[in-house]
Amino acid sequence: MARKLEKAESRERWRELRDLWNEFDPIGIMDYPDWPRDEYESYCGPSMRLLEQNAENEELEDYVHSALDYMGIGASDDAIKRFVKKMKAWFQEKWSETRV
């Protein structure tokens, strides 16, 4: 059975996922130090839910594609697949035995 996250762990998990989105940086703004670090915050919730549900890669890829469509930008399928693989590996390695 999954262990319930402490509040500090939940914040850490959220921050780490936000950092992954910032690293992916589909808009290309994270090179600007004055740009807010929460640019991709609204995409973390749906991403986290899919990760918690152990969604298939394709479902996560579809979500990232729709998020990028919403932003009005695109990314290569390979870039999206690498990003999804990285998110899933991070979650499985560190957080898969936990729950909110």
Question: Which role does the model predict for each range below?
Answer:
Residues 1-100:
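Charged, amphipathic alpha-helical regulatory modules used
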